């Protein structure tokens, strides 16, 4: 649709949430001539207030004034605001269109979009893909769930390519946006509290990443994920398919053979010794294959791809080695906010473990990690306000179980319980909002406490 017509149709845009995505969307909307109002039910960080003020954008914090919101022609909603929020219910009753910042920004750029989602591995794959492109000299921007607005660079510092991490919450409010390259790493239960505890609702959200794709576009996915396989058979994606797997299965475009990774695209075949990959572990092999396929599809030269796959340093709060104290390794995996992420972490561990679990439960099924916990963990520390569900599942399955109400207490108890040669692993399985501002805050506190031992 012609962008001028959209402007005429959508005179007033109200943005709910004034974090990174909301503030960026406000700047872009203002630049495109809309009447813009920003409302945040919480407090707005000073840097975002300054940004809004500098662009002459009206805002409010600590409330949602209905008279200033319900008159909107279109709403741009922060992904953190659930559909059950009272203001969202009223907007839906009124029939006001509600979109995401990514959807809005996509209207105003013709850049190539490489979009990544999945229950686990999406941040690592996003950062790795971005690293590969930038090292190869591509004019690439980084956006989405990694903490960067897409709208702000579209408004003020446009790029030729964007590498975008997409959460299910962002995908929920995307309609006309199209990914040129879509990557779906895996689907396991997560955020079910936001999806009425219906797994299919979450699956449907993830598959929105292939919405509007044509045969000119690419869909990269893990070939051995049973949910993805079922949904592909049901949905018949229009995009050209690029499955990846650990072994050379029929039809896969990325795989390993004879201790090499092999990637096959129309831009040629890429090979690399598997032991030269910077990221170790099976889950990171999949991340490297997905990034490698995407990179070959945008014609990154083999020598650039090989160099970047071998020198990438990883993602903070994801299996991050913090320190070794008196023969005990401390690993920060605070980004493991679901059970499957913790499963990958436990699978990669080779020493006896003291495991720190807990936080805000999102409908978790801990049976997925039960056998690994019984096999590898000799002490559990439950870090949270309400640990009843954890006790109900794990009591009697591990020799020692302790509770902690702060990170300082959790690390102090782990220090006493760990023996030389052990690893203390923070891999919580849960969201962080009971005791911490975010998973980053939780991980930062863990690192600070470890360094103070």
Model-predicted segments: where are they?
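Short internal beta-strands
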Residues: 35-41, 219-223, 356-357, 376-385
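Residue-level signal for inorganic ion chemistry
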Residues: 29, 75, 116, 145, ...
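N-terminal leader/targeting and accessory segments in enzymes
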Residues: 1-100, 104, 392
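Nucleotide phosphate-binding/pyrophosphate-handling subdomain across enzymes
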Residues: 3-7, 11-12, 22-32, 139, ...
């Amino acid at each position: 649709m012609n962008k001028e017509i959209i402007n005429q149709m959508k005179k007033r845009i109200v943005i709910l949430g004034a974090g990174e995505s909301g503030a960026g969307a406000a700047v872009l909307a203002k630049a495109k001539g809309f009447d813009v109002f920003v409302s945040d039910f919480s407090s707005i960080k000073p840097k975002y207030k300054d940004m809004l003020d500098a662009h002459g954008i009206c805002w409010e914090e600590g409330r949602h004034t209905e008279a200033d919101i319900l008159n909107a022609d279109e709403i741009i909603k922060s992904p953190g605001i659930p559909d059950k929020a009272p203001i969202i219910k009223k907007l839906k009753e009124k029939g006001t269109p509600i979109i995401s910042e990514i959807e809005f920004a996509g209207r105003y750029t013709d850049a190539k979009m490489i979009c990544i989602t999945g229950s686990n591995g999406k941040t690592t794959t996003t950062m790795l893909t971005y690293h590969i492109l930038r090292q190869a000299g591509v004019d690439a921007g980084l956006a989405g769930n990694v903490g960067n607005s897409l709208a702000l660079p579209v408004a003020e510092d446009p790029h030729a390519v964007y590498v975008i991490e997409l959460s299910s919450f962002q995908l929920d409010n995307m309609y006309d946006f199209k990914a040129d390259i879509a990557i779906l790493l895996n689907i396991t239960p997560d955020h079910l509290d936001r999806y009425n505890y219906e797994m299919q609702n979450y699956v449907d959200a993830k598959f929105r990443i292939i919405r509007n794709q044509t045969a000119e576009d690419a869909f990269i996915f893990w070939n051995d994920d049973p949910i993805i396989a079922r949904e592909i058979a049901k949905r018949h994606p229009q995009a050209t398919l690029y499955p990846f797997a650990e072994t050379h299965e029929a039809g896969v475009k990325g795989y390993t053979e004879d201790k090499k990774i092999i990637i096959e695209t129309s831009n040629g075949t890429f090979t690399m010794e598997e032991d030269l990959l910077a990221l170790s572990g099976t889950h990171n092999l999949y991340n490297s294959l997905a990034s490698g396929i995407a990179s070959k599809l945008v014609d990154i030269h083999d020598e650039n791809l090989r160099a970047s796959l071998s020198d990438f340093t990883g993602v903070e709060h994801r299996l991050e080695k913090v320190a070794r104290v008196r023969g005990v390794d401390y690993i920060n995996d605070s980004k493991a906010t679901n059970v499957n992420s913790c499963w990958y972490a436990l699978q990669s561990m080779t020493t006896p473990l003291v495991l720190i679990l807990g936080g805000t439960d999102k409908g978790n099924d801990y049976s997925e990690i039960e056998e690994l916990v019984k096999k590898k963990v000799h002490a559990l520390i439950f870090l949270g306000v309400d640990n009843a569900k954890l006790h109900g599942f794990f009591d009697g399955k591990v020799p020692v179980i302790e509770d902690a109400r702060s990170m300082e207490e959790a690390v102090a108890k782990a220090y006493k319980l760990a023996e030389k040669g052990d690893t203390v692993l923070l891999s919580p399985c849960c969201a962080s909002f009971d005791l911490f501002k975010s998973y980053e805050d939780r991980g930062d506190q863990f690192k600070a406490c470890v360094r103070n031992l």
